[in-house]
Structures are given as C-alpha cells and as structure tokens.
Amino acid sequence: MKRTYQPSKIVRKRRHGFRARMATVGGRKVLAARRARGRKRLSA
C-alpha cells in the first residue's frame, strides 16, 4: 500500500492556494477567519 501523501507543488497550489480560496464563499470565510486570528500565512 502506498502512502497517502504524495507531495506536488501544483496540486497544493490549486487546492489550497490563495486564488482557490478566493474562488468560493467558504474559501473567503477561511481567509477572513485567518486574517481575524492574525495568521502570518493566509494560504498555501
């Protein structure tokens, strides 16, 4: 059985990147929550 995490920079950016977050209402809420918390990095 192979490991579940097979790193890929492209997939990481597409799924968890800033533009992916901005594309949906839920993603915008995630960013807003992270801004409110004062996170240094908002997204991948």
From Swiss-Prot:
UniProt similarity note: Belongs to the bacterial ribosomal protein bL34 family.
Keywords: Ribonucleoprotein, Ribosomal protein
NCBIfam families with a match to the protein in the record: rpmH_bact
InterPro entries attached to this UniProt entry: Ribosomal_bL34, Ribosomal_bL34_CS
Annotated organism of origin: Beijerinckia indica subsp. indica (strain ATCC 9039 / DSM 1715 / NCIMB 8712)
Protein name, UniProt field: Large ribosomal subunit protein bL34
GO cellular component, one term: ribosome
PANTHER family the UniProt entry points to: LARGE RIBOSOMAL SUBUNIT PROTEIN BL34M, MITOCHONDRIAL RIBOSOMAL PROTEIN 34 FAMILY MEMBER
GO MF entry, a single one: structural constituent of ribosome
PROSITE patterns for the chain: RIBOSOMAL_L34 (PS00784)
GO biological process assignments: translation
